[in-house]
Amino acid sequence: TSGDLNAVLAGIRAAVAAGFERVKLNCVLMRGVNEQELWPLVLFAAEHGLPLRLIELMPITTTDVLTEKNFMPVHEAMELLRQKDELIPQPDWRLGFGPAKYYQLKHTGARVGFIGAMTNLHFCETCNKMRLTADGKIRPCLGDHGEMDLREALRHAPDDAAVRELLATALQRKPLEHQFRGAYQPCRPMTAIGG
């Protein structure tokens, strides 16, 4: 985190203590930046009974952070964890509605999901998400710029049917695959897209 780690950890503990059912930890993999933190994150996740998701760096931010130097594919993260514990595939686990492939670590009991958006050619086949941006737009795909204005529809729709129609149209516009490998140029930071 670029913020106060103690505040982040306190927030996670508070969410668990408050009874939130779907607390998940996300970590964007960055070679040379956080690979030494993966095992402590696994231990923290195991201690608190939380799933940890390790996510490949994607070209989402408006700055150029995705480089060959700092990109770490999920298979490298898996190898780092295999040096500490055995990874047992859990193909039937669906913790949430995302494309993570989950494993349980034999000795720690940790649940770790790997999200290989850049290296898994079949990544998009299991994605059933749409994003709601901070300014009320529906984005059918994280890796595509197409958006529809849900906020305006909610303000001006005569009934729920118009909103349902907009959502159905947005879902139909969901592309078969993201555009990250092509000439994709980010236009919004992740904080504005919604994650």
Which residues fall in each region the model found?
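Radical SAM/AdoMet-radical enzyme domain recognition
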Residues: 1-55
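Auxiliary Fe-S-binding modules of radical SAM enzymes
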Residues: 43-47, 57-195
